């Protein structure tokens, strides 16, 4: 941060939210061949004329991007059922399809629509023919145990895309037992030096759609971090020719300056309860970790070391911080207990390890590992254990984990430009999210919303 060139231009703050079409497009680079084959059948339109929207394109893309599923092409489908009683299970089983999502859309009132859908287990349906029975209150009734989930909702005409993400969440959980994260968002910084205001802080759906610009600036913006309720972002701005930490509501765009100490004000991260921020300050000398109480403005110094301590992240219980430190000679990851002050080294593999963040379960830590001069995203058992390198890209940085722990978004370099990329937590699925103009960096995945 000390090397950033400060230019003498006034800041422009976009206090009115600006929404535009997504500037990110996910390009899958690896992993679909190992995913489970499923079918997302086009929903049957039960109205006149053309259907108002196509849900299934979004759903199929969501499930494919999870890295766990490989939806077959619509052209390869042996039939297009709209409900479980229309399914020819043998035909689907012959294709190796494990599950089917079917549904329908019908007019409900002016610009409102009834959407029905079912998630079907093909193998179970093939065994029972969809007609298995169970004993209930002394009587045999149809069990429908091949129907993993079945729902209906009335939605407005402008809610098709968001409801498609909702259906994806339901299908993902029905098929994996884990909560889906398709209705989440990402925050990031875009940089285009050809613009009058080159730096933009933006929020979009996890897939890059519905981008909303929160802030435009001629000076650098960095390190966005979500509040646990998903309503606010904390970030660093150089708008006043020095590093300062701000907090901003993503819906009202109202913002508040939190710190403006001499020197570095960086790496703000909300505590799990949303009441505090961990951050890096150099007001007392070299960069150290501090905890800032958002309500009282009280400041607690956490580390005292002659070298740099930076990149704090909270453990899920809120009792400790994971951070990067050069106290051992090279950057490595450590943890510090906020009550006792006890510091523990966590990483030993490779030349350097930086930017540690825990998955929601607290069982693994995602980090940037440098080995033979290459920076890759890696996973290590927490607090200590085996390390697995997840990526093949280079110059990887700023990993952020999905709230269900299934995916990691991070910044990397592709064709000499900074882009965002995705990798599944097991490293099998990989994708890029290049910007259509300029560069993009500092991603932060939202909590469940």
UniProtKB/Swiss-Prot annotation:
Keyword Cell inner membrane attributed: no
Signal sequence segment: 1-21
Lineage: superkingdom: Bacteria
Gene Ontology cellular component list: periplasmic space
Record has Cytoplasm as a keyword: no
Chief location: periplasm
GO BP of this protein: cell division; protein import
Protein's job: Part of the Tol-Pal system, which plays a role in outer membrane invagination during cell division and is important for maintaining outer membrane integrity.
Assembly behavior: The Tol-Pal system is composed of five core proteins: the inner membrane proteins TolA, TolQ and TolR, the periplasmic protein TolB and the outer membrane protein Pal. They form a network linking the inner and outer membranes and the peptidoglycan layer.
HAMAP family: TolB
Protein name as catalogued: Tol-Pal system protein TolB
Encoding gene (name): tolB
């Amino acid at each position: 941060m000390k090397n950033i060139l400060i230019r003498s231009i006034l800041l422009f703050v976009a206090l009115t939210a600006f929404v535009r079409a997504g500037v990110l497009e996910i390009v899958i680079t690896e992993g679909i061949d190992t995913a489970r084959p499923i079918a997302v059948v086009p929903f049957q339109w039960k109205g006149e004329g053309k259907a108002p929207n196509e849900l299934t394109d979004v759903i199929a893309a969501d499930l494919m991007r999870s890295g766990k599923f490989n939806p077959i092409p619509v052209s390869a489908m042996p039939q297009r059922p709209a409900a479980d009683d229309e399914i020819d299970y043998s035909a689907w089983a012959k294709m190796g399809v494990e599950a089917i999502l079917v549904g329908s859309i019908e007019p409900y009132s002016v610009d409102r629509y009834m959407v029905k859908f079912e998630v079907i287990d093909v193998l179970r349906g093939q065994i029972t023919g969809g007609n298995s029975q169970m004993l209930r209150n002394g009587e045999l009734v149809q069990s429908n145990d091949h129907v993993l989930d079945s729902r209906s909702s009335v939605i407005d005409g402008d809610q098709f895309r968001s409801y498609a993400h909702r259906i994806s969440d339901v299908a993902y959980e029905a098929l994996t037992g884990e909560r889906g994260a398709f209705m989440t968002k990402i925050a990031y910084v875009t940089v285009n030096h050809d613009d009058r205001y080159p730096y933009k802080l933006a929020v979009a759906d996890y897939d890059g759609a519905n981008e909303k610009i929160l802030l435009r600036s001629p000076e650098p913006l960095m390190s966005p971090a979500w509040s646990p309720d998903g309503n606010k972002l904390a970030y660093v701005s150089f708008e006043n020719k020095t590093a300062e930490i701000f907090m901003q509501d993503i819906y009202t765009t109202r913002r508040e300056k939190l710190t403006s100490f001499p020197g570095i004000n960086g790496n703000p991260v909300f505590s799990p309860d949303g009441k505090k921020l961990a951050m890096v300050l150099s007001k007392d000398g070299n960069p150290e970790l501090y905890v800032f109480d958002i309500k009282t403005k009280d400041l607690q110094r956490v580390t005292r070391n002659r070298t740099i301590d930076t990149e704090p992240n909270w453990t899920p219980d809120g009792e400790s911080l994971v951070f990067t430190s050069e106290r051992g000679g090279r950057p490595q990851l450590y943890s510090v207990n906020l009550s006792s002050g006890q510091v523990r080294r966590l990483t030993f593999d490779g030349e350097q390890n930086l930017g540690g963040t825990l998955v929601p379960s607290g069982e693994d830590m995602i980090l940037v590992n440098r080995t033979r001069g290459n920076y890759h995203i890696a996973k290590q058992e927490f607090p200590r254990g085996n390390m697995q390198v997840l990526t093949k890209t280079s110059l990887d940085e700023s990993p952020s984990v999905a709230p269900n722990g299934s995916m990691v978004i991070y910044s990397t370099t592709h064709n000499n430009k900074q882009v965002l990329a995705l990798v599944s937590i097991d490293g099998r699925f990989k994708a890029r999210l290049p910007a259509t103009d300029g560069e993009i960096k500092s991603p932060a995945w939202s909590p469940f919303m």
